[in-house]
């Protein structure tokens, strides 16, 4: 396995923890850096299908198309699916990159849910993301409500 890069060089990618990154919509030119960071799973929250290059081994791509629209909430089942896949990748020693169009709302919601799956509270997850990614807006009403709803139902999902 190639040696993991020690720092992010792309301004589009923010490292949240040792195992979690958030970015805007990555392009083909970002694939080498994503692989070098040890990313083994990309969770794509954009409604447009991402480049197939993002899913080339050793990386797996999980496309979870969602919309950033206050009247069309992100489905909790979609967030659950992303978290379950992320936890598996993390347990296997890989990192996870979550992206949407701008890396502000949908990716932030999914990343917060991954952190909750790892044991963070909703408040701690949102705070950490805000500290690590300046453009992140987990407090947008339609995003925060999804994070909190996910946190409330997660104990039942993880135990099932």
Annotate each PLM feature.
Residues 1-2:
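N-terminal carbohydrate-binding accessory modules
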Residues 5-95, 116-148, 154:
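Cysteine-based protein phosphatase catalytic domain of the PTP/DSP
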Residues 93-112:
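A phosphate-binding catalytic loop at a beta-strand-loop-alpha-helix junction
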Residues 152-160:
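C-terminal domain-closing interface element
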